[in-house]
Amino acid sequence: MANSNTYLTTPTKTPSSRRNQQSQSKMQSHSKDPINAESRSRFEAYNRLQAAAVAFGEKLPIPEIVAIGGQSDGKSSLLEALLGFRFNVREVEMGTRRPLILQMVHDLSALEPRCRFQDEDSEEYGSPIVSATAVADVIRSRTEALLKKTKTAVSPKPIVMRAEYAHCPNLTIIDTPGFVLKAKKGEPETTPDEILSMVKSLASPPHRILLFLQQSSVEWCSSLWLDAVREIDSSFRRTIVVVSKFDNRLKEFSDRGEVDRYLSASGYLGENTRPYFVALPKDRSTISNDEFRRQISQVDTEVIRHLREGVKGGFDEEKFRSCIGFGSLRDFLESELQKRYKEAAPATLALLEERCSEVTDDMLRMDMKIQATSDVAHLRKAAMLYTASISNHVGALIDGAANPAPEQWGKTTEEERGESGIGSWPGVSVDIKPPNAVLKLYGGAAFERVIHEFRCAAYSIECPPVSREKVANILLAHAGRGGGRGVTEASAEIARTAARSWLAPLLDTACDRLAFVLGSLFEIALERNLNQNSEYEKKTENMDGYVGFHAAVRNCYSRFVKNLAKQCKQLVRHHLDSVTSPYSMACYENNYHQGGAFGAYNKFNQASPNSFCFELSDTSRDEPMKDQENIPPEKNNGQETTPGKGGESHITVPETPSPDQPCEIVYGLVKKEIGNGPDGVGARKRMARMVGNRNIEPFRVQNGGLMFANADNGMKSSSAYSEICSSAAQHFARIREVLVERSVTSTLNSGFLTPCRDRLVVALGLDLFAVNDDKFMDMFVAPGAIVVLQNERQQLQKRQKILQSCLTEFKTVARSL
């Protein structure tokens, strides 16, 4: 193994006169080279474009070099070597937590480095910083100020520094915070993960070149950060690997085989990846910039000399000489970046033209918006057209639509229950699953599904058990006035009370669920309106920026739907009060005995024969036929009778009396008995006798549906309590049937859907536009809004000027390519 002292000797100073002569001759050759002049103009154009992109938040695919690595892997030293001067003279660990965009400009007139920092919120640069020690202080202070403002440990917002110097290349590098395993004292524990995530985000764009640094003392197989680089660029196609502090490894090489194996890095980086091996001066004493650059050059020379003379057999110079030394890396980075700049110039020019056009359009829209703040008539017209368009889209969604995609905007039954906050149906213990419950629906389809779900829930409720005390309190009160009448009225009163108690919450829940379905249509109508305008490229007024107006439209629509729900609740409650009135019993009783739709509901989740509800979800195929909600049960002559086909012994009471018939036809039976009863008995006794003498088979109620039993096992042998309970269940079923089939369904449709189709645009128009101009303009011009719009226009104008300047410069560059 070679002695380590043989390759590092104390640097000696080059005579000042000879050094100045070398520098002057090099600068003269650079100034006379037309290729370098062309490269510099291209580099300057990209630098200005990069500054504009940082200032205005533009996402431009500018070729850039991103330096990544561990916090102690020598990134700062490499940047200083590229700059040609030291800026962290005091060797203080900056520990920056923000990216640093370092724009190096080869300026022959800058015999001393001139560093300027771009303003945080502008594309302008500050005054030149002459003191090298001030550079690190500015980086540190800016980082601390931003992190304190954002209350974060790291920030992706970059610091931009422009360094003009005669001894630096035309190069731009983004220095990233170094990877760390553990947070510094006072930092959050998540800081290492946040740094890793931010660096990956900065290095991921495909137009960026990765400059990955790793100390030579770290073996490839145990590299902690090499895996992170592989996640960003798995094939290393855009990664330049730099082995830093290479001088620390030289003493371990004894023969050529060891050196060549190490330099090839075979088995870890792939066959086409050749890392660069760099060593930099370790002397951190205060020296001049010229001496610093001389030491860099001397270290390169000493490393090559040691590999040639200090290692037995030397090394494969033909294969590895171009990858060793800082000078080789600097030349490669500069040439590689210039090559990428040249390749990207046409695409950059096209992108700049597109961005300039977009900014011009934004300027026109902003001018129109500022002008519109004083044109009330124009705003009224645009707002009315927009509101009418939204209302029309709501109507179209109610009538049935497939745009936008129901898979994205629709909801299943479970999602509706959860998002509405209503949950299950009150008083229903079973899980109600209407047809198509698993499909994502909206609009009219979702409305009809909720209606059917309400029907299923209503028919799942049985008449609740009644205590003997309640029966006795009603029955015994009528004991002295005829037992038959007492039994009938007791059962009817029990049924009416149960219906009011159990069906009223169902009606309120149905209204709330339907209101949620209609309320959800506003967002879908907005999306539909946006898609339609985009699809047909309609030149309608852009209302996107008027937040106050959009909030007002949303609030008006929400109030409209809530008012509909309130009105519908009152209507269905009125129907419930009517059907549970003692005077309505004769109507639904007679109709029932002639055969009504009620007989079809022998299971809680079955629809009536007149209801059409198609099961479209896949789950229905696997269920037994008897559980199909949308298929009516098979008819049984012994259990139900077709409406209008009753037996001759039954009295037909029309559901809706004909205008040509007097009302006495409907209630003639009762009136005749009141006026002409031969036995002198009152109407109530006659009614009790009429009900008691009908040929009705005994029955029982199961799951809310009517199940007929044999007459031999009927009420003849039952007690008065059992008779009343059975009769109450019968009355409850009749009340429920009349309420659901005749009243509620049609009321909900006419109470919700018809107003949304016919009155929505009028209601919104009255709320929004039937006001004076001052109140109307409050939706569009908030206090100070005009000043904000004017400031936005100034920013757009500034952005337009910068981008136009970059475009002109790139056009000049493109002509020279």
From Swiss-Prot:
Q: Which Pfam families match?
A: Dynamin_N
Q: Which GO terms describe its biological process?
A: cytokinesis by cell plate formation
Q: Where is the composition biased (Basic and acidic residues)?
A: 618-629
The induction text for this entry reads: Expression is cell-cycle regulated. Expressed during mitosis from the prophase to the telophase.
GO-annotated cellular components: cell plate; microtubule; phragmoplast
User: Which residue windows does the record flag with biased composition (Polar residues)?
Assistant: 1-20
Q: What happens when the gene is disrupted?
A: No visible phenotype under normal growth conditions, but when grown at 16 degrees Celsius, seedlings grow slowly and root tip cells form incomplete or twisted cell plates.
Q: Where is this region: Disordered?
A: 1-37, 405-425, 616-658
The coiled-coil segments of this chain are none
Tissue distribution: Expressed in root and leaf meristems.
Q: Record-annotated residues binding GTP?
A: 69-76, 175-179, 244-247
- For the region G3 motif, give the residue spans: 175-178
Q: Which residue intervals make up region (G2 motif)? A: 95-97
Domain called Dynamin-type G: residue spans: 59-346
Q: What is its main location?
A: cytoplasm
Q: Name one GO molecular function term.
A: GTP binding
Q: Which stretches does the entry tag as region G1 motif? A: 69-76
- Return the annotated region ranges for G5 motif: 280-283
Q: Which SUPFAM superfamilies match?
A: P-loop containing nucleoside triphosphate hydrolases
- Briefly state the protein's biological role: Probable microtubule-associated force-producing protein that is targeted to the forming cell plate during cytokinesis. May play a role in cell division.
The identity of this protein, by name, is Dynamin-related protein 5A
Gene of this entry: DRP5A
